[in-house]
């Protein structure tokens, strides 16, 4: 019965994304901080070993929402605003501060991510009338875009999804699973 505890929960962290690699016994969680200090990546494992990585951008504390994190190969992909930040896993494992750079601009607000061995999916939470797509089920108001891990600048496909999505995955059978929620009280 192995489990891990996110070390930031009692220190003002607001967890956003989670990525798990069972083969390497790695759990990564992104969080922004209530006190507006640097956003973080928490690295934990099944032995409850913990490491905190603070994010910087242009030498200053990066305080973005860091809504999603995914792992594929030797890289972690973090979504924030309209950008994806690609970070070497080895840096997360060894450094206390990581400069995230300018990131790669994507075609949506990059609220969440999912990665497999070939693709990175980047989607947005949107609840406004931004990307309205009408179908027999109703109106969808958000998108999720698929990128090749070899080229994060050119969309491979764009999916119309319901609004208020906070998590996304593609199963081994090719099914798309969406997770929705919003406005949990403090």
Predicted feature locations:
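Blade-loop segments of beta-propeller domains
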Residues: 14, 48-74
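Short, conserved, GDST-rich strand-edge loop motifs in beta-rich repeat architectures
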Residues: 28-35, 123-140, 181-186
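Beta-propeller blade signature
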Residues: 39-47, 135-150, 186
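Repeated scaffold domains used in trafficking and secretory/extracellular systems
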Residues: 12-19, 61-68, 105-117, 162-170
């Amino acid at each position: 019965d192995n489990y891990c505890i996110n070390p930031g929960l009692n220190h003002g962290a607001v967890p956003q994304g989670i990525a798990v690699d069972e083969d390497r016994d790695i759990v990564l969680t992104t969080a922004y901080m209530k006190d507006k200090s640097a956003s973080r990546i928490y690295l934990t494992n099944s032995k409850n070993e913990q490491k905190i990585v603070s994010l910087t951008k242009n030498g200053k504390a990066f305080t973005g929402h860091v809504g999603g994190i995914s792992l594929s190969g030797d890289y972690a992909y973090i979504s924030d605003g309209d950008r994806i930040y690609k970070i070497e896993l080895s840096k997360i494992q060894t450094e206390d501060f990581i400069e995230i750079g300018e990131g790669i601009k994507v075609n949506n607000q990059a609220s969440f991510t999912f990665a497999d061995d070939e693709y990175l999916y980047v989607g947005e939470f949107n609840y406004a009338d931004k990307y309205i797509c009408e179908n027999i089920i109703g109106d969808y108001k958000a998108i999720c875009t698929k990128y090749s891990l070899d080229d994060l600048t050119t969309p491979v496909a764009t999916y119309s999804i319901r609004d208020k999505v906070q998590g996304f995955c593609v199963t081994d059978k090719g099914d798309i699973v969406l997770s929705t929620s919003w406005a949990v009280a403090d």
